[in-house]
Amino acid sequence: MAQQIQAIRGMNDVLPAHISAWQHLEACAREVAGSYGYEEIRVPLIEHTELFKRAIGEFTDVVEKEMYTFTDQGGESLTLRPEATAGIVRAAISNGLLRGARHKLWCIGPMFRHERPQKGRYRQFYQLDVEAIGFAGPDVDAELIALTARLWRRLQLSGIRLEINSLGTPEARRVYREILVAYFRRHESALDADSRRRLEGNPLRILDSKNPQMAQVIAAAPLLTDHLDEPSRAHFAELAGALDRMGIAYRVNPRLVRGLDYYSRTVFEWLTDALGAQDAVCSGGRYDGLIAQLGGEVTPAVGFALGIERVVDLLVQAARVPAPAAADVYVIVNGAQSGAVLHMAEELRDALPHRRFEFNLGGGNFKAQFRRADKSGALLALICGDEELARGVVAMKPLREETGQTECPQAELAARLEELLVRLTSRRSG
């Protein structure tokens, strides 16, 4: 026997038994995003490496340590996307979407980061990304947060809390960066190796460290909110006021920063205590300088990314996963006329496109086929034997109640079948 090939570490299969939670989340996300006027966009999984270096930042962990980068046969450096915002912005610029227009876009798909795999953090992971491009005011920041709050309600999830902060303008952040670096230089002996490295490239990320031995020195660090420019203060105050009026609870977390360099002003995260260390299920913020940074006109924008696997875990924990759809009808062939019965099943699918038909494939005696019908979860079995077909009838046998089978003329089968399925469905749901 040939040696089995396993999945790559940190890249998981989603099997049919688990897919209903994913489909439910994706359907709810599509519904909620659409209700706010967002349109779907699909962008490549692979982009030029330079896109992510320029967008995310040379000194971020993502660019330095986590990207899947390779040189193709033509000598170009390409990267599997570690996040979607840069690709969406690149698509908007490349396709001229931003010429005097504003766009509200969303997409769902896989991202790739070479991290240490653990529950809730994988090397291939899926995200819902929602981006509002061309909108400058705090009202769109508030609407995006309201959209996520509505999605939690639509999914019937509770215990997800919101934290918000402002990173100010790049100019204000540069001033704060110098103050922060000077502070950490005075306490460099208290920093771990990773944080000392970040002092040179991305010192704000030190504030996001989870190292408990650094908690005290981080808690005493200067606050960015004490050094905000006045326009950013006003923007943040309007956002907070809008959230208050909508009844969306939040906590201002002055230590909240984002791991990607393109963020400015508003940043936010939705957190949960139900997933252990991986507590962030949705993160976002404003990136007013990114589009110009990638070669477009100066254009304001804001967006968020939601971790699909983490929200699926919450749905499973909360028992909010709809049952997988079972077949309505299982077609049993008790004889040699499988071709004729296949044709009949196709006609039934034409007549009843909203119903699910499972045809017994691969043969088997009547008893074995009936066991398969029962195991399929179908409400009803259609029994098509040589004798019945010769008389122009088909037998119908309910599988979920103690009712005898009845015969139906083939010419009336679709109508009679639908009538019986409506009755059986109402009994099962009742």
Description of each model-found segment:
Residues 1-428:
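TRNA-recognition modules of translation machinery and tRNA-sensing kinases, especially anticodon-binding
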